[in-house]
């Protein structure tokens, strides 16, 4: 089955437990599919994507990390980007799920959480994808700061 047929068949949405992370997640895949639908001017595909965006129900406890790549700030970044298409109702919830991981005692105020062999490791990082830089970038955009270099368009 194709990706779209797995989530949409017989005119019924088949959304299940989705992976909403930025890297290899369903939101980015559907954004790509939506952009393709716009290019080929396929209203049926566009409708599928918009219904997917409306059905987003993110279970944040599954996301261990606040980071952009595989954590809560990546979800926030995607939802902020989707504002161009529609008004996602989960933007504020996504923001609060990033902020809950803020700790004054951490070097960069946020820590990446990696899981290996059933154990969790918390790491102080300051890079874009798995560190505090990406988290602060998403928070800045949430508060309306301008993306002067167009990074959002590059990574989305």
Task: Mark where each language-model region is.
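Terminal, non-catalytic domain-edge segments
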Residues: 32-35, 39-43, 51, 55, ...
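Hydrophobic strand positions within the blades of repeat-based beta-sheet folds
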Residues: 29, 75-76, 135
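Solvent-exposed loop and edge beta-strand segments that line ligand/cofactor-binding
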Residues: 8-26, 56-72, 118-131
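Loop/turn-rich, solvent-exposed surfaces of beta-rich toroidal or solenoidal domains
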Residues: 62-94
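Long, well-ordered mid-to-C-terminal structural blocks that present hydrophobic/aromatic surfaces
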Residues: 1-56
């Amino acid at each position: 089955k194709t990706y779209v047929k797995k989530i949409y068949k017989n005119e019924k949405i088949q959304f299940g437990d989705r992976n909403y992370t930025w890297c290899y997640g369903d939101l980015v895949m559907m954004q790509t599919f939506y952009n393709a639908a716009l290019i080929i001017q396929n209203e049926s595909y566009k409708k599928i994507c918009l219904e997917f965006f409306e059905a987003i129900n993110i279970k944040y406890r599954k996301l261990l990390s606040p980071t952009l790549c595989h954590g809560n700030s990546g979800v926030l970044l995607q939802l902020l980007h989707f504002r161009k298409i529609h008004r996602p109702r989960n933007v504020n919830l996504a923001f609060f799920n990033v902020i809950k991981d803020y700790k004054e005692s951490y070097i960069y105020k946020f820590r990446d959480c990696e899981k290996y062999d059933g154990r969790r490791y918390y790491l102080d990082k300051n890079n874009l994808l798995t560190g505090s830089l990406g988290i602060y970038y998403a928070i800045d955009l949430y508060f309306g700061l301008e993306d002067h270099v167009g990074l959002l368009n590059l990574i989305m």
